[in-house]
Regions:
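Active-site neighborhood of HAD-like aspartate-dependent phosphohydrolases
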Residues: 1-63
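Flexible, charged surface loops at secondary-structure boundaries
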Residues: 2-6, 80-81, 134-137
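Short, well-ordered beta-to-alpha junction loops that form the rim of enzyme active sites
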Residues: 13-14, 91-92, 145
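Generic beta-sheet signal
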Residues: 21, 89, 164-166
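Glycogenin-like
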Residues: 50-54, 60-61, 66-69, 73-75, ...
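Glycine-rich phosphate-binding "P-loop"
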Residues: 56-64, 113-120
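Short, acidic loop-to-helix structural element flanking the phosphoryl-transfer center
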Residues: 60-88, 94-99
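C-terminal cap/substrate-recognition subdomain and adjoining C-terminal extension
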Residues: 84, 96-192
Length: 192
């Protein structure tokens, strides 16, 4: 296969990337509080809901992903007009399966995604994403959580990790940083 006809494999996180989620700005605050040791957890250990009440609260918190990201229709056009393989790689825990299925019907309404991969076994999100990036042999992966971006960029030599930033993290330098999803799709369109 020549370089001109090579299919690019691209992966997208769901919450905060494909789905607009204004509460994602709080991730920066949570990350900083972990760095300041305000929480007794490791930097890259994500909370997992265990009790029924915790799972209910987790479902309610994820209602903040309330619409498709601005630029999603641009992604659909991009998918139909380019040699690409698009994949969803979401670390949503299994307690969110019903909501995830609902969103998947809307996100894949034009059958643009080759695969939709969800964290049904409740692995740590960064480890799940690293494993899926390897299995899918992705060329690019778009993520909105900088802690995950930093981890993946460290362990994924063959995959370019793109960061969909937020207003609280604008001071952080990163080579593949975007402020909105429309920018991501525009960059993918130019990056042939």
């Amino acid at each position: 296969m020549t370089q001109a006809t090579q299919i690019r494999r691209i992966g997208f996180d769901m919450d905060g990337v494909l789905l607009y989620n204004p509460s994602r700005i709080f991730r920066a605050l949570i990350s900083r509080s972990k760095q300041a040791h305000l929480f007794p957890r490791k930097e890259l250990e994500f909370y997992h809901p265990n009790t029924n009440l915790e799972k209910l609260l987790w479902v309610l918190v994820h209602q903040s992903s309330f619409k498709m990201a601005d630029g999603f229709s641009d992604l659909e056009n991009f998918a139909h007009n380019n040699q690409v393989e698009l994949n969803i790689v979401s670390a949503r825990f299994s307690c969110l399966q019903a909501d995830t299925r609902k969103w998947l019907k809307r996100l894949n309404r034009q059958q643009i995604f080759t695969s939709c991969n969800f964290n049904d076994l409740d692995e740590q999100p960064h480890l799940f994403k690293a494993r899926m990036i390897d299995e899918l042999k992705l060329d690019y992966f778009v993520e909105d959580n900088f802690d995950v971006v930093h981890y993946l960029a460290t362990v994924q030599a063959k995959t370019e990790i793109w960061w969909l930033s937020n207003i609280l993290d604008q001071h952080i330098a990163y080579p593949h940083k975007f402020v909105n999803f429309k920018e991501v799709v525009a960059a993918l369109s130019q990056n042939k």
